[in-house]
Amino acid sequence: MILLALPNKGRISKPVNEILEKAGLKISVHGRSLFAQTVDPEIKVMFARAKDIPEFVRDGVADVGVTGYDLMLERDTEEELEMLLDFKFGNARLVIAAPENSTVNSIKDVKDGMKIATEFPGLTKRYLEKKGLNLEIIELSGATEIAPFIGVSDLICDLTSTGTTLQLNRLKEVENVVSSTTRLVANKKSMEDPEKCAKINQVLSGIKSVLYAQSKRLIMMNAPKDKVSEITSIIPGMGGPTVSEILSNDKMLAINAVIDENKVFETVTNLEMLGARDILVVPIERIL
């Protein structure tokens, strides 16, 4: 049996749960319970704060978990965890920012003794030390952007996705500390246990199959027999397209193929020009 730690709230909680459900690992949640069953009796779920998950997995409280790379760095656990997968979403950057009217325009302008407010004191301190800087770190638990304007700090170190929030709060980015995405991580001892490792790999395989399918589409059509070679040349598919007879029409063939989502528009246009008809483009839930 393995215990999977998932964020109990926040921007990555919903998409992660949706991916697990598409992978076939439906979670039975009852009210505000901190633990839940899945359709697999050998996989149980624990809901926790995303910031606590790196330590829970490192310490063996959970066997595998989902968290942000920034939180792994903040808890200084990245070397102690087995990094299994980058979800490629939940993108954010931890940046140092200053008020727009500040004389600080880059990390070179930051001076020892300045105050910096952040929700990431550990990561911020280590980064500044690598830069040879000694700042007073003010730990906050939210609304970091206001700190320079109420005399709490000179700078902030905070997460940003697009930079819009910084601009709205009259702040400018002066240094990028780290880029972060959502990660699947495992306890190293659990990965050495054959039974637990096998179950963790099942979870990993399921997630990978959903993520891979998100960028693909199944395209189906009826096409003239004399155009099949031209059509199959523009939809190679995965191992080649599937071509089959249509019982009611001996001049047409049914063709199915998997293509990249970003090629759908161009491909459909080309197929129509070659005489394909009854074209269907369908989302795919999983590809194994």
From Swiss-Prot:
PROSITE patterns found in the cross-reference section: ATP_P_PHORIBOSYLTR
Domain of life of the organism encoding this protein: Archaea
UniProtKB keywords: Amino-acid biosynthesis, ATP-binding, Cytoplasm, Glycosyltransferase, Histidine biosynthesis, Magnesium, Metal-binding, Nucleotide-binding, Transferase
Needed cofactors: Mg(2+)
E.C. numbers: 2.4.2.17
Pathway: Amino-acid biosynthesis; L-histidine biosynthesis; L-histidine from 5-phospho-alpha-D-ribose 1-diphosphate: step 1/9
GO biological process: one example: L-histidine biosynthetic process
Principal subcellular localization: cytoplasm
Regulation of activity: Feedback inhibited by histidine.
Xref: InterPro entries: ATP-PRT_HisG_long, ATP_PRibTrfase_cat, ATP_PRibTrfase_CS, ATP_PRibTrfase_HisG, HisG_C, N-reg_PII-like_a/b, N-reg_PII/ATP_PRibTrfase_C
Subcellular location: Cytoplasm
GO terms for MF: ATP binding; ATP phosphoribosyltransferase activity; magnesium ion binding
SUPFAM superfamilies per record: GlnB-like, Periplasmic binding protein-like II
Substrates-to-products reaction catalysed: 1-(5-phospho-beta-D-ribosyl)-ATP + diphosphate = 5-phospho-alpha-D-ribose 1-diphosphate + ATP
GO cellular component, one term: cytoplasm
Role according to the record: Catalyzes the condensation of ATP and 5-phosphoribose 1-diphosphate to form N'-(5'-phosphoribosyl)-ATP (PR-ATP). Has a crucial role in the pathway because the rate of histidine biosynthesis seems to be controlled primarily by regulation of HisG enzymatic activity.
Similarity comment text for this entry: Belongs to the ATP phosphoribosyltransferase family. Long subfamily.
Name this protein carries in UniProt: ATP phosphoribosyltransferase
